[in-house]
Amino acid sequence: MGARMDYGKIWIDGHVHEYADAVVGPMSHSLSYASSVYEGIRAYRAKPLLLDLHLARLRKSCEIFGHRFPYTDTEIGVACAQLMQMHSVADAYIKIQVILDDSGYGFQGKECKSK
């Protein structure tokens, strides 16, 4: 088995973590039922391009799936800037992914927490 790739720092539940510390449980709703939603955003000169439109689309996807997305556009913008600074990059591809954990059960995952 190959070595796990190290992506440095990531942002989970409002906090910066080491990529190696990120864990998605094997029984998480998103892994079991492919119920995650994500948005890919390009950043140039340390500014995410059309961030407001990307986040509006992400929120709509979360609404359709019944996921909770508790962060404001400002909080996400600050997190993006913080991570780009930590990685010393100005141009980047940012992926925001919302998953449901393993705190609930059932096909719809209504009791599961969004992460």
Model-predicted segments: where are they?
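Conserved alpha/beta cores of soluble small-molecule-handling proteins
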Residues: 1-115
